[in-house]
């Protein structure tokens, strides 16, 4: 039979089998389950599959991360701090540790309010114990920054209550040294009602192309309702300017995803 001549797709070596099993273990199937959460939370279940979730849910995620690293490299200053606010599993911090070892005494700090995410990040960066510090904290009035050369928010501001965004951005502005920079990657709304739904549909097509079912996409959208609250890009840029930043520009855009440098 013809099928018998087809090459086997089964993993042949032990290393390949381990890699396959790891991929299955860390694959995002949270919204496949009929008992999937009705409200999205950054708990241990999400932390376990979060890297896969980002890769399959955020268009051009790696390219955007690399752009962010390049900005941080340009802004990195000895004896100053680079903060990743909402660091999740520490993927950006891992890239940074590999990219800026030549700049002495730059302090990398990951901040997240999810203990599960912080634990995952600590494990991921266990080979770099002296390079990165972690803080479990909410980004509210009580959080204090050290003198910063760069502050990054990767798809984090969209989860902050809208009324708390302006004071947080003001605090970020005041924490940056002269010449420091703020890098903001964010899900946004179209400026035009007519295009908004098309952007959403194209994003759903992207997810389908990365293995998510229609049901998973729908259930996740419902779970994120009032948890992830995107604004129009013009509104977010206005908030950044009102915080004190005089130079604000878009360095990345994919339909309803944008990257800002300020």
Per-range role (PLM):
Residues 36-39, 44-64:
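Class I SAM-dependent methyltransferase Rossmann-like catalytic core
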Residues 60-79:
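Conserved alpha-helix/loop element of class I SAM-dependent methyltransferases that forms part
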Residues 81-83, 90-141:
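Class I SAM-dependent methyltransferase SAM/SAH-binding core
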Residues 152:
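A conserved beta-strand element that flanks and buttresses the S-adenosyl-L-methionine
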Residues 179-187:
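Conserved beta-strand signature within the Rossmann-like core of class I S-adenosyl-L-methionine
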Residues 188-241:
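C-terminal alpha-helical "lid/dimerization" subdomain adjacent to the S-adenosyl-L-methionine
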């Amino acid at each position: 039979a013809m099928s018998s001549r087809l090459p086997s797709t089964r993993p042949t070596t032990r290393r390949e089998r381990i890699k396959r099993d790891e991929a299955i273990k860390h694959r995002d199937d949270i919204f496949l389950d009929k008992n999937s959460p009705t409200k999205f939370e950054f708990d241990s279940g999400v932390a376990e599959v979060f890297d896969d979730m980002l890769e399959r849910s955020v268009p051009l995620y790696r390219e955007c991360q690399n752009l962010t690293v390049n900005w941080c490299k340009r802004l990195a200053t000895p004896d100053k701090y680079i903060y990743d606010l909402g660091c999740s599993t520490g993927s950006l911090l891992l890239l940074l540790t590999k990219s800026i070892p030549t700049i002495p005494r730059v302090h990398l700090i990951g901040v997240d309010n999810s203990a599960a995410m912080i634990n995952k990040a600590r494990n991921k960066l266990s080979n770099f114990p002296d390079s990165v510090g972690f803080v479990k904290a909410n980004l509210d009035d009580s959080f204090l920054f050290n003198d910063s050369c760069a502050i990054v928010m990767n798809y984090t501001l969209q989860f902050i209550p809208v009324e708390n965004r302006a004071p947080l951005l003001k605090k970020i502005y005041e924490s940056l040294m002269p010449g420091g920079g703020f890098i903001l990657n964010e899900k946004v709304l179209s400026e035009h009602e007519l295009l908004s739904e098309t952007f959403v549909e194209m994003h759903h097509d992207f997810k389908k192309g990365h293995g998510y079912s229609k049901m998973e996409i729908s259930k996740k959208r419902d779970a994120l309702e009032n948890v992830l609250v995107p604004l129009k890009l013009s509104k977010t840029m206005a908030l950044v300017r009102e915080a004190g930043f005089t130079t604000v520009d878009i360095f990345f855009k994919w339909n309803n995803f944008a990257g800002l440098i300020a």
